[in-house]
UniProtKB/Swiss-Prot annotation:
Zn(2+) 6 binds at residues 361, 364, 369, 373. This is E3 ubiquitin-protein ligase parkin. Pathway: Protein modification; protein ubiquitination. Zn(2+) 3 binds at residues 240, 243, 262, 265. It is an enzyme of class 2 (transferase). It catalyses: [E2 ubiquitin-conjugating enzyme]-S-ubiquitinyl-L-cysteine + [acceptor protein]-L-lysine = [E2 ubiquitin-conjugating enzyme]-L-cysteine + [acceptor protein]-N(6)-ubiquitinyl-L-lysine. GO terms for biological process: autophagy; positive regulation of metabolic process; protein ubiquitination. Pfam families: IBR_2 (PF22605), ubiquitin (PF00240), zf-RING_12 (PF17976), zf-RING_14 (PF17978). Zn(2+) 4 binds at residues 255, 259, 291, 295.
Length: 461
């Protein structure tokens, strides 16, 4: 794409966005953008009751052609002259005008994609075949979107979406499909549906399907959204597996049983698993969850479904996913309270220093120490030298709350030799362990033996 074409697309997108609120004029005319396959975009005003034949009559003279020499393409279909504008799944989108090439076999005009998908949906339902879902609910005639998407910009939420088609090679919208998609696999997988690209100089053979948000005016051909293929209209009236209510829409898991849950119960399910940190790290799908019934082959592949969580929960989900990735890669998380930064470590080096300044052992995640790591029950307590021994497990249960242990970890560091917690109350960084039979000299900063380098660099911090 040249700089001029890129700049033109930006201007078209801005014009569409700024003028959409004025699309309905005093004469009830709708402003429509028609893009030619030889470059340039034409703006025409039409009555919503107008048909494609009227579009050709307005557009053809501006292209120097006769109406019969022009075909109009929208969402992978060459439209019939009798197709009425208002029945299209159209929301400030772009129609494509292409000169008819009489030397080659042209595609037979067809119904718009939104109508043919309705017919396919009913047929596939009878055959019990997975199909692209659409809504048969009443009072939804004006909303032709049959999909759910996550709109990252500007809506930043889950909305209904609309299916669009372009050439997989040049990404131009003047592409007609040979057959309609029969399943989600046809839409999501590459090179499933063949067709003809009408863009000059392109010989692309495969369709690329993508989705746009139906809740805001199109911001250009590059305005896309993430499809949420598990969220569907509940036209079958299936009850939720948790609350047994019949809700719409619902989420249908990919397990063999195709378990159904309402969106509210799905949010509760994800929230409880997130709180207990029970999401699983899948090698192909990332940090995700399976069907709550424990079915095999039921992991959620598109993680944007978790956008149903609150912003705070989704931020926590992202943090946990990042931490899990680091742990799976052999890294560690800084044990310093209030930090938790992920660190990829050298497996041959036990001494790890976080950017927060905390130095710890890469194996046991305790403060850095010399010698072998000790089991938690082997860590010495100062109280063991008196007549009042404390059991670590019972001591853990006897806490008022976790605040005291957090303060201790922040204000103290363990002796690198014997692990006795030591608090620094000012002064220099030269520490001497006070535990009997230890007396190890060490550096508060690097948590290693007190040496000349420490004297030079760390004496006062």
């Amino acid at each position: 794409m040249s700089i001029l074409e890129w700049f033109w697309n930006i201007l078209c997108g801005m014009a569409q966005y700024l003028t959409f609120s004025k699309n309905l004029t005093n004469d009830n005319l709708v402003n429509i953008y028609v893009k030619s396959n030889v470059g340039g975009t034409i703006s025409v005003n039409l009555d919503p009751k107008s048909d494609i034949k009227n579009v050709k009559e307005l557009v053809a003279p501006k292209l120097g052609l006769e109406p019969d020499d022009v075909k109009i393409i929208f969402a992978g279909k060459e439209l019939l002259d009798s197709t009425v504008i208002e029945v299209l799944d159209f929301f400030s989108d772009i129609l494509h005008a292409v000169k008819v090439n009489k030397k080659i076999k042209n595609v037979i005009p067809d119904k718009p994609l939104c109508e043919t998908l309705e017919e396919l949906h009913q047929l596939n339902d009878q055959k019990n075949v997975e199909s692209i879902e659409e809504s048969n609910l009443k009072n939804e005639g004006k909303n032709k979107a049959h999909f759910f998407i996550y709109c990252a910009n500007p809506c930043k939420k889950i909305n209904t979406g609309k299916l669009r088609v372009c050439c997989s090679e040049c990404k131009h919208g003047a592409f007609t499909v040979d057959t309609d998609p029969q399943s989600w696999a046809d839409v999501l997988d590459k090179n499933k549906i063949t067709g003809v690209c009408n863009n000059v100089g392109c010989e692309g053979l495969y369709a690329k399907f993508y989705f746009k948000c139906a809740s805001h005016p199109s911001q250009g051909e590059n305005d896309t959204a993430v499809p949420l293929n598990l969220i569907k209209r509940n036209h079958k009236k299936i009850p939720c597996l948790a609350c047994t209510d019949i809700c719409d829409p619902v989420l249908v898991f990919s397990c063999d049983n195709r378990h159904v849950t309402c969106l509210e119960c799905f949010k509760n399910y994800c929230g409880s698993r997130l709180k207990d940190r029970q999401f699983l790290s899948h090698p192909d799908f990332g940090y995700t969850l399976p069907c709550p019934a424990g079915c095999s082959n039921s992991f959620i592949e598109e993680v944007h479904h978790f956008r149903l969580l609150t912003d705070a929960q989704y931020e926590q989900y992202h943090r946990f996913a990042t931490e899990e990735f680091i742990l799976q890669a052999g890294g560690v998380l800084c044990p310093q309270p209030g930090c938790g930064q992920g660190i990829l470590i050298d497996q041959n080096c036990n001494r790890v220093q976080c950017s927060c300044g905390y130095v710890f052992c890469g194996k046991c995640l305790e403060g850095f120490h010399l010698g072998e790591c000790l089991n938690p029950t082997d860590v010495p307590f100062l109280s063991q030298n008196c007549d009042y021994p404390l059991d670590p497990e019972k001591l853990e249960k006897a806490r008022w709350d976790e605040a005291s242990s957090t303060v201790i970890k922040v204000l103290t560091k363990p002796c690198p030799k014997c692990r006795t917690s030591t608090e620094r109350a000012g002064g220099c960084m030269h520490m001497i362990c006070t535990r009997a039979n230890c007396g190890f000299h060490w550096c508060w900063v690097c948590q290693g033996p007190w040496e000349r380098d420490c004297m030079a660099s760390h004496w006062f911090g």
